[in-house]
Amino acid sequence: MEGNITDGLKYVGAGLATLGMIGSALGVGNIFASFLDAAMRNPSAAPQQTGNLFIGMALAEALGIFSVLIAILILFVA
């Protein structure tokens, strides 16, 4: 009986850890929406801001990748 409760709580913890991907997805969406809005207002400045776009996207995606990594660690190591 003890092992079943522990296994169940492990799955709940892994599921909660993956909720960080929601924030990552919202962040990437906001970054691209803001970039496209700015590019439509001032097309001549868009090429200069593309590097900033990809840096911001990479930082936002890193948080989602870290949350998946934590979920995998909870499932297979703990």
Swiss-Prot record:
- What SUPFAM superfamilies does the database record attribute to this sequence? F1F0 ATP synthase subunit C
Residues annotated as coiled-coil are none
Instruction: Give the main localization category.
Output: membrane
GO CC entries: plasma membrane; proton-transporting ATP synthase complex; proton-transporting two-sector ATPase complex, proton-transporting domain
What subcellular compartments does it reside in? Cell inner membrane
According to UniProt, where does the site described as Reversibly protonated during proton transport lie?
Answer: 61
Q: Which Pfam families match?
A: ATP-synt_C
Membrane topology of this protein? Multi-pass membrane protein
Domain of life per record:
Bacteria
Going by the UniProt record, its keywords in alphabetical order are:
ATP synthesis, Cell inner membrane, Cell membrane, CF(0), Hydrogen ion transport, Ion transport, Lipid-binding, Membrane, Transmembrane, Transmembrane helix, Transport
Give an example GO molecular function: lipid binding
Q: Which residues cross the membrane?
A: 16-36, 57-77
What PANTHER family does the database record attribute to this sequence? ATP SYNTHASE LIPID-BINDING PROTEIN, MITOCHONDRIAL, ATPASE PROTEIN 9
HAMAP family from the entry? ATP_synth_c_bact (MF_01396)
Describe the subunit structure.
F-type ATPases have 2 components, F(1) - the catalytic core - and F(0) - the membrane proton channel. F(1) has five subunits: alpha(3), beta(3), gamma(1), delta(1), epsilon(1). F(0) has three main subunits: a(1), b(2) and c(10-14). The alpha and beta chains form an alternating ring which encloses part of the gamma chain. F(1) is attached to F(0) by a central stalk formed by the gamma and epsilon chains, while a peripheral stalk is formed by the delta and b chains.
| NCBIfam families for the chain | PRK07558.1
What's the family?
Belongs to the ATPase C chain family.
* Its job: F(1)F(0) ATP synthase produces ATP from ADP in the presence of a proton or sodium gradient. F-type ATPases consist of two structural domains, F(1) containing the extramembraneous catalytic core and F(0) containing the membrane proton channel, linked together by a central stalk and a peripheral stalk. During catalysis, ATP synthesis in the catalytic domain of F(1) is coupled via a rotary mechanism of the central stalk subunits to proton translocation. Key component of the F(0) channel; it plays a direct role in translocation across the membrane. A homomeric c-ring of between 10-14 subunits forms the central stalk rotor element with the F(1) delta and epsilon subunits.
Name of the protein: ATP synthase subunit c
